[in-house]
Amino acid sequence: MTSNKALETLLEMCEESNASDLHLAVGLPPRFRIKGSLVPRDDLRAFDAADVEAVAMELGRAAVPLGGDEGVERVREVLLREKSIDGAVTSSSGVRYRFNVYRASDACAVALRRLDSRFRSFAELGVPERIEAFSDERDGLFIVTGPTGSGKSTTLATMIDIINHKRDGHIITIEDPIEYIHKSDRCVVHQREVGRDAKGFNEALVEALRQDPDVILVGEVRELETMRTALRAAETGHLVFTTLHAGDCVGAIERLIAVFPPDEQNSARRQLSLVLRGVTAQHLLPREDGGRVPACELLVNTMASANHIATGHSAQIYSVIETGGNNGMVTLDQSLERLVRSGAVSLRTALGIARYPPQLKQRLGVV
């Protein structure tokens, strides 16, 4: 079987079994994540090093686009130097996948994530519908945070889709890789992939400010200069969306500020307090009936929270969220409480990520 055929067969199996993820490792049969559990298929043999490498090279050529043997050698060269390669591919049935090819135990390994083929509403995703209101903002910064695999990209893709269909403007996305494809509707949408269409996140963001955008999506802000440029874009009339890796909204704010040198952090806090529109933190949890469900925290940046951000009293922001239900705000623990009461997740699961486990148990009447 050719490497292309092997890859296509595996992707078909993902779709047939409604798997969210596929993992390839030397010495093991392919494993599929179904309803949150990583399971093998009885009809597939263990993959040897050549099997895994063949699929890895086929995927790698999608991220390092050169044809024939030259393409394979280029993939090997990049993998040897960088130790991993990110990218995205589309199956013959039109389903899009994000992948990471990486080195492990001196061999190739592969992780693929199946992406939704259609855009869902926030209600369908199970995240606070109040988030949709941020699509009406004309400028400022909105952050989606959470661990890897928590649905951050899906939430932002839904936001971009909503804006694309309800207002006129120019949307620029800067991604690595491009995961969801947006077709221009009321908006003109340009999607730029780092490495293919742009040199880097900051370079693309600087260039975007010369391209008359209304909305900018930055897949992830990792470096100081990118953060500076994103804040400048947000305060000069652009609506900026991005992601960070943090467990909650307060953690995201602190992580953003920590990127700046100590002598710049006070001014960064003041700048952020003015441009921030909101932060949502997401965690995907196993459902009691199978599958996964999001627990979400949401901060809407009010005058009270803006003052706490500006003065460095980040711990007080949690109280603003806790008492901000009238503005659509919700803490992670409040979200967990609702999920436990509805029977969607177990108490044990909720306590595992709760900010204040004893208080959560008390509210649920658990001794």
Residue spans of the language-model regions?
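Short, flexible helix-loop junctions that flank or precede catalytic/ligand sites
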Residues: 1-367
